[in-house]
């Protein structure tokens, strides 16, 4: 056994140390030297194509198997011909991808569109470096300040949510401001309640404009700017349709013992007379030959309107035209440099009866009633002693336009009384309510008030006079209407 192992070791060659290979000699010709001999460049090596996906290593855990391979990210767009994409991979390597002609055209078109979009983009910055808030928060913050300053009840402040149907809060703010700043304010043919109501509506409109809130189906002021065209020609008036009103005869009969009858005898002794009506009762009759009505009401009797009428009627056309000229001169006194508002009238179109958000039409007129009122005891005022231009306008034209409830009900009136209210305000006081709200705003906020765009009046069929009311649904908690 030992001899066999010894013989096997002898046959195994020794691999421990091998002699180095012989050095290669370098020989030069007689005409050459080592310095003159140029090295021959080696041929370029082929670049390894890195576009091929590298073979991933075998994962060592289950988590590595489930992980998605990193995606390549477009880093640079080459300017070679043909163009190539240089893609950056997650492992730090790069790859090159050729682009087709169609892809190049798509990229050029998208780049042109992005340049055009950048030209139309408006960059909005916050110059005050203040946090941006929503319109609702902006309005709530301003109203919280006003409600606290003008002593609105705590319960109403807690329930206030800056909603369009919370107009009573604005009215209370204006009422407190009037009592503190404008005590003893004089109004002409206007009630304090209606004046405060309109101020609250204007304040609500300014607050919504300040906050940037706009209600598409609800206008808070309930007013319009009407281009009436009632002073362009002598004796010509226009109704709300924009058409010329028709002249007709109008006979008014009043009870002799009533307040209106006694006032008619005192103010119009030349026209009013006591006579017997067809039932043999003594009444005060006033016959007006200059009454004006809508052209749809030519065939209708007194206090009757057709289904297409606008509901506008003047018992004395000349008095109405004087009232329109009065408000023109009155506005020109306050705004002598105005260019667009002279022939326009700011008029409320929704009284308290119509100031509902349900959008349902009411019986009768759908707009406020417009009536010209005489200014008594103006003839004895000397114009040379008066310097106020607004007062001079009223002295020169002693009639005022008064806006009342759409369907007023008078005392001792016969028939069923429909929905009515005590809404009553004159045209100069409507402008006064707007001006006082601007003063209130200037006392509590810096800068000028926001733009309050009051809509311009345009006739629509939904404003026609309605002789029949829609059926009313009163509601019921039962599931079935009848018992079976």
UniProtKB/Swiss-Prot annotation:
Oligomeric form and interacting partners: Homomultimerizes on viral ssDNA bound to pTP. Forms a initiation complex with viral polymerase, pTP and hosts NFIA and POU2F1/OCT1. Interacts with host SRCAP.
Record keywords: DNA replication, DNA-binding, Early protein, Host nucleus, Host-virus interaction, Metal-binding, Phosphoprotein, Viral DNA replication, Zinc
GO MF term list: DNA binding; zinc ion binding
UniProt-listed GO biological process terms: DNA replication; DNA-templated transcription; positive regulation of DNA replication; viral DNA genome replication; viral DNA strand displacement replication
Protein name according to UniProt: DNA-binding protein
Organism field: Human adenovirus A serotype 12 (HAdV-12)
Phosphotyrosine, modified sites: 150
Similarity remark: Belongs to the adenoviridae E2A DNA-binding protein family.
Region (C-terminal arm, DBP binding) location: 468-484
Primary subcellular site in the record, as a coarse category: host cell
